[in-house]
Curated annotation (Swiss-Prot):
Annotated GO MF terms: UDP-N-acetylglucosamine 1-carboxyvinyltransferase activity
Record-given protein name: UDP-N-acetylglucosamine 1-carboxyvinyltransferase 3
Binding site for phosphoenolpyruvate: K22, N23
Family: Belongs to the EPSP synthase family. MurA subfamily.
Catalyzed chemical reaction(s): phosphoenolpyruvate + UDP-N-acetyl-alpha-D-glucosamine = UDP-N-acetyl-3-O-(1-carboxyvinyl)-alpha-D-glucosamine + phosphate
Subcellular localization, as worded in the UniProt entry: Cytoplasm
Function: Cell wall formation. Adds enolpyruvyl to UDP-N-acetylglucosamine.
Cellular component annotations (GO), alphabetically ordered: cytoplasm
Length: 424
């Protein structure tokens, strides 16, 4: 158990660097197994899920070198063989399911435990199975293990019934070594989908259309290791932006791609927050209480569900009543009772949170139930009067690198307390 103690009421001030995007890094690490030789990933965030993936690849026979100072992960695939990854590790993170398509495409067989990750609602993997089956894979469940095999995958037309980042990437990875051409329709368009496609192409693959709703993958016989820099984390950037606004601070974020955070910037400006784009940096100034606004989560390029919890926290201090509608995951409001403990006035009706802004939040003991809920509680604690103790910070550390270090750099009064296993 990891606990964060926050003595709130201090405006955040200063400059920090945003790390690499978690949701790009994990599929990129999996994708290195598609290629012969050595691949090098740069700007890799030092977070728990990356360390889990490193151990998963090592267990499959890869040699993985990690340079935490420079954020460089190097994967040598010469020793990789088909096998079943460690159950405890693989079932602890959702992104372990990318190993299914990768190992199936490269070795003709794969075994992966049912994925874990945050408990934010129903996130079925049926679209992954549908896509891989269309490519010719035989897939079955065996006592909590997903097993798949195919002599060689063959290109096919795959229509995804729902827009799914995971399924889009899964099919794209598997199709890269399939025989023939695969057309994937109703694709997710997130920048990390594009990042994975770019890596496949750098390795010698033939992927076009990433970033649109239709992706074409012409399979090749062999991929060779390549180097890629992980794109900045849009959700980390958005979290710090909302923290600056909520504490009425002045924070500059380096290593950002403003076009990737357009909906977050737009909503902050609508709420009266100053947002200045400075090339590959963004400055956020919160001079007064935010104004109430309405927010609806949507697939990219809409407002991201992963930033909804933090926006809800921010709007709990807004002037007026805000309506926040969550269209993607039904359990994204599980953190609301924790905010209410701090004095927020929020009522949830179905998939909409009705947030009546208050002038002040107050420190309280609260619990983080997932990555983004925990981030919301952190920024609420920073703005609250008195001391907030957040339990379950190990969830948050799955997605935010060097959190305590960055908070201290911005002038926050915080202390991380660790019990049991060390936190990476």
């Amino acid at each position: 158990m990891t606990t964060l103690r926050i003595r709130g009421g201090r405006p955040l001030q200063g400059t920090i660097r945003v790390g690499g995007r978690k949701n790009a890094t994990l599929p990129l690490i999996a994708a290195t197994l598609l290629a012969d030789g050595t691949s090098r990933l740069e700007n890799v965030p030092q977070i728990h899920d990356v360390m889990v993936y490193r151990k998963l690849l090592t267990g499959l026979g890869a040699r993985v070198d990690w340079d935490p100072v420079h954020g460089i992960l190097t994967v040598h695939t010469g020793g990789v063989r088909p096998g079943e990854p460690d159950y405890h590790l693989a079932s602890s993170i959702r992104a372990s399911y990318y190993l299914l398509g990768v190992m199936l495409a490269r070795y003709g067989e794969a075994s992966v435990p049912m994925p874990g990750g945050d408990n934010i609602g129903h996130r079925p993997v049926d679209q992954h199975f549908k896509g891989l089956s269309a490519l010719g894979a035989e897939i079955w469940m065996d006592r909590g293990i997903i097993r798949a095999r195919a002599r060689r995958l063959r290109g096919a037309h795959v229509y995804l019934d729902i827009i799914s980042v995971g399924a889009t990437i899964q099919v794209m990875l598997a199709a890269s070594l399939a025989e023939g051409t695969t057309v994937i329709q109703n694709c997710a368009r997130e920048p990390h989908v594009v990042a994975v496609a770019n890596f496949i192409n750098a390795c010698g693959g033939k992927v076009t259309g990433a970033g649109t709703d239709t992706i074409r993958v012409r399979g090749v016989d062999r991929l060779v290791g390549a180097t890629q820099t992980v794109i900045p984390d849009d959700i980390e950037a958005g979290t710090w932006m909302m923290a600056a606004a909520m504490t009425q601070g002045d924070v500059t974020l380096q290593n950002v791609i403003p076009t990737h955070i357009t909906p977050i910037m737009a909503k902050l400006r609508e709420a009266g927050v100053e947002v200045h784009e400075l090339g590959d940096a963004v400055r956020v100034v919160g001079r007064e209480r935010p104004k109430a606004i309405n927010v609806k989560t949507l697939p990219y390029p809409g407002f991201p569900t992963d930033a909804q919890s933090q926006m809800t926290a921010l709007l709990s201090l807004a002037e007026g009543t805000s309506y926040i509608t969550e269209t993607l995951y039904e359990d994204r409001f599980r953190f609301v009772p924790e905010l209410v403990r701090m004095g927020a006035q929020i009522r949830v009706e179905g998939r909409t949170a009705i947030v009546k802004g208050v002038e002040q939040l107050y420190g309280a003991p609260v619990e983080a139930t997932d990555i983004r809920a925990g981030a919301a509680l952190v920024i609420a604690g920073l703005a609250a009067e008195g001391e907030t103790t957040i339990y379950g910070m190990e969830h948050v550390q799955r997605g935010y690198e060097k959190l305590e270090q960055k908070l201290l750099a911005l002038g926050a009064d915080v202390q991380m307390e660790r019990q049991g296993a060390a936190v990476v």
